[in-house]
């Protein structure tokens, strides 16, 4: 469990064994680094209410939390969660923790528990050419 201490230090409450970390390759980005990444997003992109952001290996949601906090300077939280943020996370416990931290339900269509390599990225919306005909 020596590596689990790192995961707990980045804001997660999920206990992960070393075996789990070995088998899943889970690596969690510290909140300070997430905030630094978000600070590099141009203000015009953050202000644009049509901008969308995807984290396809969301873990417990640190990047999305940092982004959500920054977007709240320009938009209402409901608009951000329902129109701007999207996430895919493989592990059900990470997914549940991410949703709780973001203030959304686990069945919110923008925040899915799925394998990012096989997910269709529809987020509950119809996809394909026929949608635009």
Predicted regions and their residues:
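SAM-dependent methyltransferase catalytic region
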Residues: 1-133
């Amino acid at each position: 469990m020596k590596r689990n201490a790192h995961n707990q230090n980045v804001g997660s409450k999920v206990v992960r064994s070393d075996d789990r970390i070995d088998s899943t390759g889970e690596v969690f980005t510290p909140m300070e680094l997430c905030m630094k990444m978000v600070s590099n997003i141009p203000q015009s992109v953050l202000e644009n209410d049509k901008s969308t952001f995807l984290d396809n290996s969301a873990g417990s949601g640190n990047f999305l939390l940092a982004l959500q906090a920054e977007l709240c300077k320009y938009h209402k939280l409901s608009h951000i969660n329902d129109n701007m943020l999207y996430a895919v996370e493989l592990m059900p416990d990470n997914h549940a923790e991410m949703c709780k931290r973001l203030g959304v339900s686990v069945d919110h269509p923008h925040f899915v528990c799925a394998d990012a390599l096989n997910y269709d990225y529809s987020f509950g919306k119809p996809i394909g050419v026929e949608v635009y005909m």
